[in-house]
């Protein structure tokens, strides 16, 4: 007799498969959870007072071996560039929702209890409108390219409970385009940790 595989939130009996039927397609569906960030050079996951950062709410969809964000959280990245909380909030509001996809290669473990993910993130590109420095001045548009790499910690999906965890590192920020493109030297590399639970399963 096989043991039922449980998924979080809104899954139902139709979504349950016996272990010998499990494959990487069980990852497909909707996810909700938290994203926390920290400077790579600092203590991982800890704030100045030594407590874990609360993180921000995130949601994503997995389909066709792609983690798809329709509202990727960019405030921490913007804040690291402009160094001003109010200005960062203005820019994030002006940019609006940011779509970002992360492709991956899934590998089902021999025990069929989890799926490892080899992430292949692409650069995140934004067009940021900087408010005018003086009253009556013109706002300036700035092209920002954020270099992203897979984190050192393993990414994976737990089949028993539908929990998804992965890390990506924001390693470099390039400003401008063409001949004017240059690295933003004041940027501090950061690690973004995503911890999400599957709340809907897609049937491919």
Feature-to-residue mapping (PLM):
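Bacterial Sec-dependent N-terminal signal peptides
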Residues: 1-32, 198-204
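Edge/loop elements at the starts and ends of beta-strands within beta-rich repeat scaffolds
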Residues: 24-28, 157-162
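Generic short beta-strand segments
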Residues: 32-40, 122-129, 165-176
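Short, solvent-exposed loop/hinge segments that bridge or flank secondary-structure elements
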Residues: 33-84, 187
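A short, surface-exposed beta-strand/turn
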Residues: 47-60, 85-111, 186-203
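Short, ordered beta-strand-loop transition motifs
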Residues: 60-64, 109-112, 158-162
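Predominantly extracellular/secreted and cell-surface proteins with exposed
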Residues: 66-153
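Edge beta-strand at a domain terminus
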Residues: 145-152, 158-204
